[in-house]
């Protein structure tokens, strides 16, 4: 079983050019929309409609991606302006073949989360993004916040799981068991962007 303190966190980078050479082989999440969100609420702030998260990602990736690196593109699955297939095609064109559902609705709970789910802007949309990416040959990571979500992610063939920041020890134990069925295992979101 993993506790939050022993589970490896996945670094979040906002600028690929600033990625140190020694990080080329370590699993990293690229999310340019996290730039300037140094506080601990970055995972919910990045969901706000104050920027075009996927355009910022695609713009950063157009600068070049090392194909052998373990950089996973943080794709906002709830993008109201782009279809998943179009985002994935743009990633492919940029030479990126790794995707994670981040920013993610896992940062939201309560009535807001239920409303998003009711309108089709929830976990279902995120799983559809990952499912489509896998079908197109992408390696994927899934940010998860429930056993059911983790179970579905593993069933569709994700390469690894990332525990949402609010995951408790019982959830981490469940995720850890499921992550044994993946090639990359289990990570956690960091406490802050740039933190571990």
UniProtKB/Swiss-Prot annotation:
Keyword Cell division: no
GO molecular function, one term: catalytic activity
Pfam family, one: PEP_hydrolase
Keyword tags: Plasmid
InterPro entries referenced in this protein's UniProt entry, alphabetically: Aldolase_TIM (IPR013785), Pyrv/PenolPyrv_kinase-like_dom (IPR015813), TIM-br_IGPS-like (IPR009215), Tobamovirus_resist_UPF0261 (IPR051353)
SUPFAM superfamilies: Phosphoenolpyruvate/pyruvate domain
Protein's recorded name: Uncharacterized protein y4oT
Taxonomic classification: Bacteria, Pseudomonadati, Pseudomonadota, Alphaproteobacteria, Hyphomicrobiales
